[in-house]
A protein has these predicted regions:
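Serine-esterase "nucleophile elbow" of acetyl-processing enzymes
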Residues: 54-102, 112-120
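Short glycine-rich loop/turn motifs that provide flexible caps or phosphate-binding loops at active sites
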Residues: 42-45, 63, 71, 75, ...
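Acidic-and-aromatic substrate-binding clefts and catalytic sites of carbohydrate-active enzymes
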Residues: 103-107
Length: 238
């Protein structure tokens, strides 16, 4: 917290004390006493203003699946943990709640979100939908669930960052392309920023995946963080 002292209070007090020098001591004592109280109140008001201007908080909720839950990784090496480090290095007052669960679907996220919003986050990062597609669920259901989550977060006065995904082409070109495009459509319709593809710069590099060829290794998570950071940074309060 930075305290700014313009010197106005002390200068004003000295001026009044000099002006009161010719007044009786009893009257002068009352005036100076009142002035000192007023100066103290002005100082407290300045402290409150300064604290508000220089120490804004960013409370971030991450609602995702295994890609955000450090699946197969050492604790603290996933992109969400790296985000906390990035925020600290940027001197941004922040806190992160990682509510990501491996295997989570958009339906599960929608069910859990109301309770999570009771924490009154400033920003909600939604990284869901991939497990819906891997299970071959109807795209309309995924879109409906994501839209409901965005709406709920916005109604709670939170800013939203939507994180898009792609799925392997073996699910059929039509399905995979429609799945990918639904994120951009939703972001445009709901007026929220979009990270087009969380695994951009990773998906075409087999060496950056674990043995299951689905989950990235630790070395890929700084890239994932950079992908998210480009959309998140404009939402942060400095």
């Amino acid at each position: 917290m930075q305290i700014i002292d313009s010197g106005l209070g002390n200068g004003f007090q000295n001026l009044i004390e000099r002006s009161c020098s010719k007044i009786g001591s009893k009257t002068r004592s009352k005036i100076v006493g009142s002035l000192r109280l007023a100066t103290l109140l002005l100082g407290l008001l300045g402290l409150v203003w300064t604290n508000s201007a220089y120490s804004a908080s960013n409370s971030i909720l991450v609602l995702g699946d295994s890609l955000s839950a450090e699946y197969g990784l050492a604790r603290g090496s996933g992109w969400v943990a790296l985000l906390q480090q990035r925020l600290k290095s940027e001197n941004l007052d922040s806190s992160i709640t990682n509510a990501s669960i491996s295997g989570e679907t958009s339906s599960g996220g929608k069910t859990r979100l109301p309770a999570l919003l009771q924490q009154r986050p400033d920003i909600v990062i939604i990284e869901l939908g991939a497990n819906d597609a891997l299970r071959g669920l109807q795209l309309s259901a995924t879109e409906t669930n994501l839209r409901a989550m965005i709406s709920a977060a916005q109604q709670a006065k939170a800013k939203v960052l939507l994180v898009g995904m792609r799925i392997p082409p073996n699910y059929g070109r039509d399905y995979t392309e429609k799945f990918f495009s639904l994120y951009a459509t939703l972001a445009k319709q709901t007026k929220v920023p979009l990270v087009p593809f969380l695994l951009d710069g990773i998906a075409d590099k087999p060496e950056l995946f674990q043995a299951d060829r689905i989950h990235p290794v630790a070395q890929a998570h700084p890239i994932m963080l950079n992908n998210v950071w480009s959309g998140l940074k404009p939402l942060l309060v400095k």
